[in-house]
Amino acid sequence: MLKSKTFLKKTRAGGVMKIVREHYLRDDIGCGAPGCAACGGAHEGPALEPQPQDPASSVCPQPHYLLPDTNVLLHQIDVLEDPAIRNVIVLQTVLQEVRNRSAPVYKRIRDVTNNQEKHFYTFTNEHHRETYVEQEQGENANDRNDRAIRVAAKWYNEHLKKMSADNQLQVIFITNDRRNKEKAIEEGIPAFTCEEYVKSLTANPELIDRLACLSEEGNEIESGKIIFSEHLPLSKLQQGIKSGTYLQGTFRASRENYLEATVWIHGDNEENKEIILQGLKHLNRAVHEDIVAVELLPKSQWVAPSSVVLHDEGQNEEDVEKEEETERMLKTAVSEKMLKPTGRVVGIIKRNWRPYCGMLSKSDIKESRRHLFTPADKRIPRIRIETRQASTLEGRRIIVAIDGWPRNSRYPNGHFVRNLGDVGEKETETEVLLLEHDVPHQPFSQAVLSFLPKMPWSITEKDMKNREDLRHLCICSVDPPGCTDIDDALHCRELENGNLEVGVHIADVSHFIRPGNALDQESARRGTTVYLCEKRIDMVPELLSSNLCSLKCDVDRLAFSCIWEMNHNAEILKTKFTKSVINSKASLTYAEAQLRIDSANMNDDITTSLRGLNKLAKILKKRRIEKGALTLSSPEVRFHMDSETHDPIDLQTKELRETNSMVEEFMLLANISVAKKIHEEFSEHALLRKHPAPPPSNYEILVKAARSRNLEIKTDTAKSLAESLDQAESPTFPYLNTLLRILATRCMMQAVYFCSGMDNDFHHYGLASPIYTHFTSPIRRYADVIVHRLLAVAIGADCTYPELTDKHKLADICKNLNFRHKMAQYAQRASVAFHTQLFFKSKGIVSEEAYILFVRKNAIVVLIPKYGLEGTVFFEEKDKPNPQLIYDDEIPSLKIEDTVFHVFDKVKVKIMLDSSNLQHQKIRMSLVEPQIPGISIPTDTSNMDLNGPKKKKMKLGK
């Protein structure tokens, strides 16, 4: 059956165009109920159960299916995802609305509908002859959709009666819209709100905890005092932004001070503009990563960024007044040049809430169902939730979602989503850090795995087409110990003309991952492999990462080779790119390769090749540094794990050898050579990587720190910075240069991927290279897969596809890759922090030498070289008299009593695991030397109480 709609439209040129829209209706679309004679099994994919075995409902005791409306799907997805909820009919009308309004919820509901155990059925009501409805005159789209949902619910109930005479199956309409529910009941459709239905499931009381509050401003505490100003409506915000009264930007909460945040202003003209917000009322219920509108305050009210470290440890709603006192303390007198543009949040343009991991802070009021949830991420405020499972959830990691933040509530309201497990357990904590950093880590789906090669796999004649056979070359790989995903291998040999041939051979991942299929889409979504301390979250399935793509020794492997002819001064004479087949002769660790190079007794082909590579690498590095490339430092640590328990038994800084530098130099050279080639061929569509030069203000901390040691650091160019760092030596303080390089690293901007057609600045500041990309790690970086495809097309080894030459799609890919790369780095740091806690838990209290990296108003941040560990020593503690602290930002320095601390001063600290806060167990550092009465702790700390003061009773608004 065909429905058509015809109308006339005026064109830009002033003409008239006739538009005909056709809508096809069918009568062979199945209802999804197995055994339905009327449909004859017409449905496809996951179906409903013939006799639903769902939990007993007190409002609907007979077997039933659920049919939710759009808002239930949007706001109660956590309830629908629960294993107790099965046999749900998802209408096409509802699915389309959800897709338009929330991409994350749409993805979640698609995942649920694809789970056969859940028995969710998607019914295409918009194309079914009996359930399609046309929009009536005067009816808006929302009312039409509500009517379409009711028509489908009514049709289902009538249709199911035809299955058999004694059939009692019903379809229950779930809606939170009071008017829609009333209309449904008038039309004879069984209808309930989500809350009514969930509360009727007496066998599953825990489901009530997962119910979301229904409005942003809803559930206000009765008789609560108004704390925050009202958010302006979106229409007023848009007018204000257009007129320049308000500014739009991303709200970024501080990790160190819960009363402070910054807003990064959007827009080309104000790209780097940053506005400071201080105080609860100025933060005005914004949450980290929200898009907000801010009003700039008069200059007389501008403030300087606070140097105070402040964490929210309030226990009740009445702490607001105390916080106002704390806010006043933040506003200390500073010089005018230290003041920054300051503002206040006037409205929320877009909420970017997500499910948060953390712990329940159980109320001490026995009968209370209201409790505070403390997120693991210190940038997120505490969340008030209602739960009947408090005793069960205490001491466990849970997930909570925010529902709204009323004006009269100190904290937002939310609901319980999921229990992750006991706090402190490795599996639980790993799950938390992966979820908190949005690292996709679910097992690869069957759809993805279906695109893997069938085993046993071998190289065929077809694979050899357009490939060079390099299996005769003495190629080897050099990697960290235990590496199974070997991306790269190298060779060096002397040619007959006396020149050298050097090859970098990279795993040909793009041969196995073809554009657009499920494997490619999942790899693009993950973006990068994430390396945690004891596990790896692969970007591609293990069959590829550790087997077919890994350039293991003594097996034939497909590769993409970059081969140079060089003279003995490492000058490139010719460059060739080719798809190849290689057979690595050795898989070496950095230490093994170094032993070969240094050994006087080894002169085999592999060792000769390594020595040639090492000699050239030294020349290449020297030349890079002369051009202004930076050699920075960061304290990286390596754990030695117990082979049985996998607990860390030793912690030490990573040792770098010449071979580390050797491999790095040739990877850099290959990346630069490939960048030039793909940009020559695809000037508008090359995927490149740039490193922006930091603004001068970034270097202030480095320059001041060096000046305190009578050293001058020049920062006008990368070359002058590199040279002044090289000259910043102290014969009496050899570690000073390393500390300066660590500080310089903190001043740097983040390197990012970008599309060449969308940016004019290609320069890589840190490498002092005019152009750069990533080509050498396609097993663990999706950027490299795209670069391989571009290079393959450039040399005629593969064909192109539309998305590869679409700069807007490439820009979107780059945006995701930059986000995934950043999150992977954060997840890795969190993993190191957790394993450091495990190490010191077993090690007990230790005393070590440390150097001051930063000076704060009430603390010093120190680095312990032995462990590569950074921590904060606080000088103000609860329940203790505060010492007299004098902070000087210009030097910078901190005076405590008669002792003055400067950056890079040597101190001695005690390191211990502080378990007083289960939610945020942390490495606690206390000053041992220099001795300051009332501040420094004695060397003997065997009687120290690390569990902190006893808990006070919590009060929560009822």
Curated annotation (Swiss-Prot):
<dbReference type="GO" id="GO:0005654">
    <property type="term" value="C:nucleoplasm"/>
</dbReference>
<keyword id="KW-0460">Magnesium</keyword>
<dbReference type="InterPro" id="IPR012340">
    <property type="entry name" value="NA-bd_OB-fold"/>
</dbReference>
<dbReference type="GO" id="GO:0003723">
    <property type="term" value="F:RNA binding"/>
</dbReference>
<dbReference type="GO" id="GO:0000178">
    <property type="term" value="C:exosome (RNase complex)"/>
</dbReference>
<dbReference type="GO" id="GO:0005085">
    <property type="term" value="F:guanyl-nucleotide exchange factor activity"/>
</dbReference>
<dbReference type="GO" id="GO:0000176">
    <property type="term" value="C:nuclear exosome (RNase complex)"/>
</dbReference>
<dbReference type="InterPro" id="IPR033771">
    <property type="entry name" value="Rrp44_CSD1"/>
</dbReference>
<keyword id="KW-0539">Nucleus</keyword>
<dbReference type="Pfam" id="PF17215">
    <property type="entry name" value="Rrp44_S1"/>
</dbReference>
<dbReference type="GO" id="GO:0005634">
    <property type="term" value="C:nucleus"/>
</dbReference>
<dbReference type="GO" id="GO:0071031">
    <property type="term" value="P:nuclear mRNA surveillance of mRNA 3'-end processing"/>
</dbReference>
<comment type="function">
    <text>Putative catalytic component of the RNA exosome complex which has 3'-&gt;5' exoribonuclease activity and participates in a multitude of cellular RNA processing and degradation events. In the nucleus, the RNA exosome complex is involved in proper maturation of stable RNA species such as rRNA, snRNA and snoRNA, in the elimination of RNA processing by-products and non-coding 'pervasive' transcripts, such as antisense RNA species and promoter-upstream transcripts (PROMPTs), and of mRNAs with processing defects, thereby limiting or excluding their export to the cytoplasm.</text>
</comment>
<dbReference type="GO" id="GO:0016075">
    <property type="term" value="P:rRNA catabolic process"/>
</dbReference>
<dbReference type="GO" id="GO:0006401">
    <property type="term" value="P:RNA catabolic process"/>
</dbReference>
<dbReference type="GO" id="GO:0000177">
    <property type="term" value="C:cytoplasmic exosome (RNase complex)"/>
</dbReference>
<keyword id="KW-0464">Manganese</keyword>
<dbReference type="InterPro" id="IPR029060">
    <property type="entry name" value="PIN-like_dom_sf"/>
</dbReference>
<feature type="domain" description="CSD1">
    <location>
        <begin position="227"/>
        <end position="319"/>
    </location>
</feature>
<protein>
    <recommendedName>
        <fullName>Exosome complex exonuclease RRP44</fullName>
        <ecNumber>3.1.13.-</ecNumber>
        <ecNumber>3.1.26.-</ecNumber>
    </recommendedName>
</protein>
<dbReference type="InterPro" id="IPR001900">
    <property type="entry name" value="RNase_II/R"/>
</dbReference>
<keyword id="KW-0271">Exosome</keyword>
<dbReference type="Pfam" id="PF13638">
    <property type="entry name" value="PIN_4"/>
</dbReference>
<feature type="domain" description="RNB">
    <location>
        <begin position="467"/>
        <end position="792"/>
    </location>
</feature>
<keyword id="KW-0963">Cytoplasm</keyword>
<feature type="region of interest" description="Disordered">
    <location>
        <begin position="938"/>
        <end position="958"/>
    </location>
</feature>
<feature type="domain" description="PINc">
    <location>
        <begin position="64"/>
        <end position="182"/>
    </location>
</feature>
<dbReference type="InterPro" id="IPR050180">
    <property type="entry name" value="RNR_Ribonuclease"/>
</dbReference>
<keyword id="KW-0597">Phosphoprotein</keyword>
<dbReference type="Pfam" id="PF17849">
    <property type="entry name" value="OB_Dis3"/>
</dbReference>
<dbReference type="InterPro" id="IPR022966">
    <property type="entry name" value="RNase_II/R_CS"/>
</dbReference>
<keyword id="KW-0540">Nuclease</keyword>
<dbReference type="InterPro" id="IPR033770">
    <property type="entry name" value="RRP44_S1"/>
</dbReference>
<keyword id="KW-0698">rRNA processing</keyword>
<dbReference type="GO" id="GO:0000175">
    <property type="term" value="F:3'-5'-RNA exonuclease activity"/>
</dbReference>
<comment type="subunit">
    <text>Component of the RNA exosome complex; within the complex interacts with EXOSC4, EXOSC7 and EXOSC9 of the exosome core complex (Exo-9). The catalytically inactive RNA exosome core complex (Exo-9) associates with the catalytic subunit EXOSC10/RRP6. Exo-9 may associate with DIS3 to form the nucleolar exosome complex, or DIS3L to form the cytoplasmic exosome complex. Exo-9 is formed by a hexameric base ring consisting of the heterodimers EXOSC4-EXOSC9, EXOSC5-EXOSC8 and EXOSC6-EXOSC7, and a cap ring consisting of EXOSC1, EXOSC2 and EXOSC3; DIS3 associates with the base ring of Exo-9.</text>
</comment>
<feature type="modified residue" description="N6-acetyllysine">
    <location>
        <position position="18"/>
    </location>
</feature>
<dbReference type="GO" id="GO:0004519">
    <property type="term" value="F:endonuclease activity"/>
</dbReference>
<dbReference type="GO" id="GO:0006396">
    <property type="term" value="P:RNA processing"/>
</dbReference>
<dbReference type="GO" id="GO:0005829">
    <property type="term" value="C:cytosol"/>
</dbReference>
<feature type="domain" description="CSD2">
    <location>
        <begin position="372"/>
        <end position="438"/>
    </location>
</feature>
<feature type="modified residue" description="Phosphoserine">
    <location>
        <position position="215"/>
    </location>
</feature>
